[in-house]
Every structure is written in C-alpha cells, then in structure tokens.
Amino acid sequence: MASQGTKRSYEQMETDGERQNATEIRASVGKMIDGIGRFYIQMCTELKLSDYEGRLIQNSLTIERMVLSAFDERRNRYLEEHPSAGKDPKKTGGPIYKRVDGKWMRELVLYDKEEIRRIWRQANNGDDATAGLTHMMIWHSNLNDTTYQRTRALVRTGMDPRMCSLMQGSTLPRRSGAAGAAVKGVGTMVMELIRMIKRGINDRNFWRGENGRKTRSAYERMCNILKGKFQTAAQRAMMDQVRESRNPGNAEIEDLIFSARSALILRGSVAHKSCLPACVYGPAVASGYNFEKEGYSLVGIDPFKLLQNSQVYSLIRPNENPAHKSQLVWMACHSAAFEDLRLLSFIRGTKVSPRGKLSTRGVQIASNENMDTMESSTLELRSRYWAIRTRSGGNTNQQRASAGQISVQPAFSVQRNLPFDKSTIMAAFTGNTEGRTSDMRAEIIRMMEGAKPEEVSFRGRGVFELSDEKATNPVVPSFDMSNEGSYFFGDNAEEYDN
C-alpha cells in the first residue's frame, strides 16, 4: 500500500476533514449521518408518510434523489438556460408510494428545490453538508453497481465486458468529490479518461483556449487519481506517460486499456464504504440515537449493527423473489458488488448467488409499471458476521473464475485467495509491447505472469462475531472452492440506463 502518510482516510474525505484522530473522525461521520436522518424524518412529516411508508426503500430513493437534484448546481444552471417543455427547473420530485385501502398507490410529488434545500440545511445545522449528499450518491452508486452490469458502457470505450469488476462507481456524478473518487474502480477512471480523449480527438478545440486549460487540468487530475489507485511502479509510470502526453490520442487510449486489463491481476486500491439508505438513518435518529455522540464509521462494525436492528421494506413485483431482492440491497449496502460471493455468503450467513440467478429486477419502479399487482415485503439485511472494509486490492493469485466476470475487487479485509482467470486475462496481452511504454508493458506482463495461485491475500485477517465490537477474535473463513466466486457470472443483469 502506498505510504499512508500522504493519504487521507475515507472518513476525512467524507467529512472534508483536516487531519483528525479516530474519535474526531467517528464524531464527524456520525454528525453527517445525524443530518441525513433528521432530513429524512422531516421529509416523511412533509409527505405525511406512515412509519411503514417511511421505511419503504422506494420512498427513500425518491427523497434522496430530490435533495441531490436540489443541490445539483450545474444541472440547475443548465435547466435554467435550456428550458425544456414540461420541466420546471425550480422544482424537483418523484414517485412516493402510499398504502391506501390495502393497495399500494403511486403519488407524484413536486417540491420547490429551494424548499428542499431549506429542509436539508435546517437538518444539518444550517450547513450545505456536502459530505451527506456525497454519502447518498455513493449509496445510489453502490446500488447501481449491484443491479446492473455496465456491458454497453465498457464496449463503447473499447474495453471488455468481462472487466466489470473494475467498474465500481461508474454511475457516480462528477461532483462527488474526493470521497467519490476514492470509491471509483480502475475501470471507471479509465472509462472517464477515454471519453475525454475521444472528445479531444473529435473536437479540435477541446484542449484549446481558456476552457481547454480547465479541461487539461481535469485530465491531469483524473490521471493522478488513477495513478494513486495503482500499487506497482510500472503501472504508475504508465499513468505518468498518459498524463504528460502533449496531445492525448489513440496511443493513450491503448495504454489506458492496457493498464485497466492489468488491474484484473495487479489490482488497484479502491475504497469501500457501507452507505445505507436514508430510511435506515431516519428511524434510528427518531428513536433517540445520537450518531455524533456515539461515533460512527462507514468501514467498521457500525453499519452492520445498524442493519441488524433496522426494519426496511421494499415493493415487490409479481414474479420477484423477496429473498433475492434482499440480497441485492444487502450487497449494495456493503459496497460488495464485485466481492467474492463465497466470502459474502460466509459473512451474510446465507448463500449469496450470482446476479443472473436472482429473480429480481432493480429496486426502483418505473412510472409505467402497474401498481395493482405490487406487494411489499421486509428486506432481510442482517448478517451473521461483520468484517472490516478494505481499500486495498489485495495480493493476487489464480483460481478458476467464470465466463462472465473474470476477476474480483475485494470489499472486505478477510484472508482468502482472490479468484481470477489467468489464462483468459493473459490472452489479451499477446505481443503488444512496442512503442514508448514498451518497457513498462513488459514489466507489467512479467508481474502478471508471476502471480501465484497459492498466494493468500489479507493474511491473518478474519471476520468477526457481531458481539465482537473491538474486533479481537478474527474467524478466518473456510470456503467451498467448487462454488462460483463471481457475481456477474455469464450474466443476464439488465443494462444500466440513465
């Protein structure tokens, strides 16, 4: 891992913090959670939601999206300047679901953005509380990562759909700040850079003039973020090359795709945090729990304990399986879309299945879906054990992997070997080592060739009983190696569309 000295912890990123000690970090993260909870309670009052309706995850998503939209300044400016028919740039809203005469009804609500901003600031002691907004963005991003496989997006940028384990955070908005950058996967950063370079190739003025200077510094900043995720000198040197290019073009795209492929074996460090829906924080605050006073961490036992004692409901379509819907949301809550399923099954205490085997669509309900046949059920979000989230890619080793996803991105710091399909990955690296990055390419390929099957990652790290808050007795899990490790295995997940 790169020198921890120069890096800020996630909690510091999450709270724009100067250097803080653990207690201060726990308090400031707790303060952020309190703010989200208070906002949610107030919105439920405004919308006259019953306790049950307030714990409905679909209502939570609508309320979260309303506040994110109210604070999306760039989009708000754009809407003011490009008025479109039937869209009031000053208003925000969405579907709210209520139980009327034993049936679920959809009601479309509309609020002034100004009013939503006022309620949010009031819940956050007058601050804009950007950290809380980012937290909700990351929860939405984690839910997308668990629900959709970004096949089309990968193919469009010239990458391979089997590289989906690198795509964490691919739907995060640009404005998600340092905390957002920390949770983006290598593939997500590569995709953003390739899109930028392609625009530069097609639009002569992209890098020129006053705007071009801003564009250029954004490009270099993104290169540096990606460089910071890599853990080997050769991968980093390659990023320096891409960043320093006078006129980024196809050579840089090649280098970026090469480095993304290499990350399937020489994994980058990507942060993982458990970001829960607002309807979990609201009731906890309402019950009198003081997150700021008690302290809270997104990477320890706290989210597990909170989910252990939370009641969350979801609408269920006629042919969906509530247990499968629960798995989808549970994985999203722990940022675990690309984690090894065998480890997830162990932590959760029930079998976690690949996406293609789940009888469930996304959590959100489209406006044209028929409400008459909608039922609701409790989401089972409890776990058997808890484990510390990781921001390291772990070491590498080899293992039978699947036809769909060919590598994993660990979310938990737990001893295991990380599955990846070495022969499939290495087949992509035949002979392409010419050009100015040839020495780096050769070095990267040599390291990948050397990745050994018996190597164990996170040695000595285990999972913990939920009673073991101080993480004193690690339980090192044993796995059934015959089981499938990849979530998007030979997959048929829906495609993510904005």
From Swiss-Prot:
It comes from the Viruses. Late in virus-infected cells, may be cleaved from a 56-kDa protein to a 53-kDa protein by a cellular caspase. This cleavage might be a marker for the onset of apoptosis in infected cells or have a specific function in virus host interaction. One of its GO terms (biological process) is viral penetration into host nucleus. One of its GO terms (cellular component) is ribonucleoprotein complex. A motif (Bipartite nuclear localization signal) lies at residues 198-216. Residues 1-21 are annotated as: Disordered. Pfam families: Flu_NP. It is found in: Virion; Host nucleus. Residues 8-21 have a biased composition (Basic and acidic residues). A motif (Unconventional nuclear localization signal) lies at residues 1-18. Keywords: Capsid protein, Helical capsid protein, Host nucleus, Host-virus interaction, Ribonucleoprotein, RNA-binding, Viral nucleoprotein, Viral penetration into host nucleus, Virion, Virus entry into host cell. GO terms for molecular function: RNA binding; structural molecule activity. SUPFAM superfamilies: flu NP-like. Belongs to the influenza viruses nucleoprotein family. Encapsidates the negative strand viral RNA, protecting it from nucleases. The encapsidated genomic RNA is termed the ribonucleoprotein (RNP) and serves as template for transcription and replication. The RNP needs to be localized in the host nucleus to start an infectious cycle, but is too large to diffuse through the nuclear pore complex. NP comprises at least 2 nuclear localization signals that are responsible for the active RNP import into the nucleus through cellular importin alpha/beta pathway. Homomultimerizes to form the nucleocapsid. May bind host exportin-1/XPO1. Binds to viral genomic RNA. Protein-RNA contacts are mediated by a combination of electrostatic interactions between positively charged residues and the phosphate backbone and planar interactions between aromatic side chains and bases. This is Nucleoprotein.
